[in-house]
């Protein structure tokens, strides 16, 4: 109520001053025309009408403590003058829509088993994350339909996975893990759980390592195919390594898993790291001076 009264007082003051100005300008114009005394009287009366309003000033200007009126306080933000772009931190999308292979289904079996679907409630689907649209625009039935199939591919916290790994290891039958599921290390290690390596003191019999590519990433795009001479050297190297392990002293299985890595692969890996890691460049001297 007080603020409304103050606003009313300020508005009345402003209108009074406007009237004064208008009347004064009118009187000057009319004086120049030549009707001097006839116009001065109405001007005098107009000023007399507005005088009591000006003497009863607003409470803000009492005791000489003038407060600024809050008229210009709400101002739209000015455009940025500097032409340098606004740098936002990179947006990582942790849920992958493609990761619905059987290995991931095995990992998240316990989540799908939960009857009330509590795990899928608070998590909107990765498509919504990447598009940046809120799930409130969708109706309730639709969100239920979206979240239900995607619950299998939702990543878990490491603490949860530690608890469930022990139960999973007993449940996983070896037939369910095919060659396509050997891409992640966890499923490979689940295959060989409970069996110690039998290669100690004999030839290495771990056949699985021989036809496994060590550096195969699903995220690599535009990998140039190896030139034929490069491929032949790679084969020679792997054959010589195999012969060495068979003939010489017994080597460990991990030695067999080491594959000849050439420059192309390493370059691809470095690009891969740059793509997924945000490594800020060193500041220039002028920027450092600005920030200190």
UniProtKB/Swiss-Prot annotation:
Modified residues (Phosphothreonine): 143, 233
InterPro entries, per database record: DUF776 (IPR008494)
Region (Disordered): 24-178
Protein name: Oxidative stress-responsive serine-rich protein 1
Signal sequence extent: none
Keyword annotations from UniProtKB, A to Z: Phosphoprotein
GO BP terms, alphabetized: cellular response to hydrogen peroxide
A cellular component annotation (GO) from this entry: nucleus
Paired cysteines (S-S): none
Compositional bias annotation for Basic residues: 65-83
